[in-house]
Amino acid sequence: MTPTEPLDASESLQWGDQFLLGYTPIDEVHQEFVDLTGQMQRAADAALPALLAEFTVHLKHHFEMENEWMLSTEFPPRECHMDEHAAVLQSVQEVQALLAQGNVAICRDLVEHLAQWFPQHADQLDSALAHWMFSRTMGGKPVVLRRGLSLR
């Protein structure tokens, strides 16, 4: 269910060690993604247009950076990853136009979908890219220590 009102901090997406992938440039841009998504979840309606505009700028940079890495290093599964980036960016831009017309509900719906989408995208697609990039720069796989998570 999509909230019609801002969420409080305990309900919104928040950065934590569970999102670390071990390749610092990706981890840093992911933290910004999570922080902006959480801000949009907690924002009053009047603040959403400016936050979504800031998020759109972030998203363009974020995806362009990852796409460039995938292309320049010939990352094998780059096509599906880049297609997903393009689809998400297109959705955000479409919602930005609808929000400008006053449709706050669709913006809140988008933000909730982004909060649900990101963890899986990061775990599946971006973790593979992080391993790939780390192996290209360091010659191995990253070691990630996550505080407060149980071991399997």
Please place each PLM-identified region on the residue numbering.
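Small-residue-biased structural context
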Residues: 1-152
